[in-house]
Amino acid sequence: WKNSVAKVEASALEAVALIPRELQTRTYRPGGYRAFYVYEPKRRLIQTNSFKDKIVQHAFCDQVLYDALTKPFILDNYGSQVGKGTHFGLNRLRDFMREYYRKNGFSADGWVLKADVRHYFQSIRPDVLKKDVAKYLHDPDCLALACQIIDSTPDPLGIPIGNQSSQIFALLYLNQLDHLCKEQLRFRYYGRYMDDFYI
């Protein structure tokens, strides 16, 4: 990663001028990934892209993806969103537990289901994700770029944990589960942080 930063810094003006031109002419193609493992809190494969691709994704996520894809989210989808996060999610869970306790005659008798999706990022189906993205991203150029990013790994299944866009894509992928639990099944006490959820 540091070598790719040095290469871009060495020709910064050329690189900055090249990115918009490639995006406008639809000649931009995401490069390859460098893979490594992190071990906190558990062993995870991280795939990081080039510095040039990080610039594209950062701008794309901040200017397009975030606003377009987070609009349909429920309040109790806590991950990777402005004004939310782990503390927001924990506060909501605490409030739900207190409300349940009061509504049930100050009895703590009840159950909480806590679950997660095993190997979540690695199990996301690109074909399903692209259909979900297309529901909310209507500009054809932006949709084409999103699909390029989704398809940019050599693996036929999954999205890289190291991409900024993967955080937003992963939140969207389980959005239908959120709406099913909250609206159709009417689970008041439901919340999700990425692939971890409780009922």
What are these regions (language model features)?
Residues 1-129, 151:
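Conserved two-metal-ion catalytic palm core of "right-hand" nucleic acid polymerases
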Residues 22, 96-194, 198-199:
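Conserved polymerase palm-domain catalytic core
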